[in-house]
Amino acid sequence: MSDTILQIKNLNVEFPVFGGIFQHEVSQVHAVNNVNLDIMSGKTIGIVGESGSGKSTLGKAIINVLKLTAPDVRVYGDIILYPQTDDAINVLHIKPSQVKSYRSDVQMIFQDPYSSLNPRMLVGDIIKEPLDINTSSSTVEKQDRVAWLLNKVGLNKEQANRYPHEFSGGQKQRIAIARALATNPKVVIADEPVSALDVSIQAQVINLMMDLQEEFNLTILFIAHDLSVVKHISTEIAVMYLGEVVEYGDTEKVFSDPQHDYTKTLLESIPHPDPVGREERKEERLKLERFSM
């Protein structure tokens, strides 16, 4: 347990479905179903699966933001952070005194930098906001931290005085990464962080995240549907299907010797530039569609 930074035990997320004249609950959607994961410190875990598999819901459950948009959602089980310097924190039973600590230790990078950055705020204030909320640092210390973070993500301190619309998509995602790192977190949840970017920019952002992960010994949960990207960045992979983790293991092992039929179908459906065997791969993509029905 000493190397475990985050433990997920029997996690379930249910969204009630209401119907009838009086809008009573008539059924539930089980978005996450009995998920168990032990996540080691300093690792990058790829969470993969098609749309609707529950991977983004899992990330939002860990960051504890589901009820902000779905107040009727039911989340039960255990999500335990082991910060090593303090007592363990169970996010589903969190104490008021632990909230700031947890928000500092666990941060999230969202999929769309165009909507995740406040267009009315200067970039420096966007990056500084987590420090304003979760720390008691002085104004000068915060400004120095912002300048340092901008440099770390490949931007410069002068750009702190600009607005998000003045940046490209790749630069915006660099700003989002800087914001996530502001409080020196132990765990970063990256929810499809490059899917909205051009392929050439994707590679730059992925390489940046890998460099930062190594430099700061970050634990990253990298949520994605692009298996090629996940293979490049992840040390371990969890494959989700219909809310369940159907396969979990070392990245190379999962790619070279997948055990679950769904994992095999996902891997076989990866686009390949070689025209030889195109029909066979087309058949595998059709099989994946049938698998999802």
Name each model feature, range by range.
Residues S2-T4, V17-Q23, A88, D250-M293:
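Short catalytic/signature loops enriched in Gly
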Residues Y82-D87, V140-E158, L267-E268:
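Conserved ABC ATPase "signature" region
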Residues Y163-F167, Q171:
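Conserved ABC ATPase signature
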Residues V230-H232:
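A short, surface-exposed alpha-helical micro-motif characterized by mixed small hydrophobic
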Residues D78-S101:
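ABC ATPase NBD Q-loop/coupling interface
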Residues A182-K186:
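A short, proline-enriched helix->beta-strand linker immediately N-terminal to the Walker B motif
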